[in-house]
Amino acid sequence: MSHLTTFKNNALTNTKRDLLAKSVAEITGLELDYNHKNIKNTWINETVDASFKYNGKHIAVGLRFETNADGEEEAVVAGDFYGTGLNQEELTNKIAQVYQKNKVIETCLEANWFIDQDQITTESNGDIVIEAYRYA
């Protein structure tokens, strides 16, 4: 059934917007468009901070950046998932997981750790394994 929903994930608090866009782009068929700020279909017409493109087409799903009770900015997935072929909870969790992976990699590299991108693996349970090395 078509309706507007919002979905949050604590891992998407205090996000770096450029790193978030990079993370979304790593998910097959998905892209984040910061220039397209209106999502709509027959049932909804909402303003967002960025919209999603899925398989090259804008869909009625986007991101809003809201301030939570602690005063921190958090990315909230909002929109109408009906007919997109996407699941709101799975999508939000996948974005959060890939974002956290990229955040760990960025933090390690800033601290002069070496990460072989080819050695990053995903376990059968979905956990991402990153090996970081530091030479003395």
Q: Residue spans of the language-model regions?
A:
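Interaction-mediating elements
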Residues: 1-136
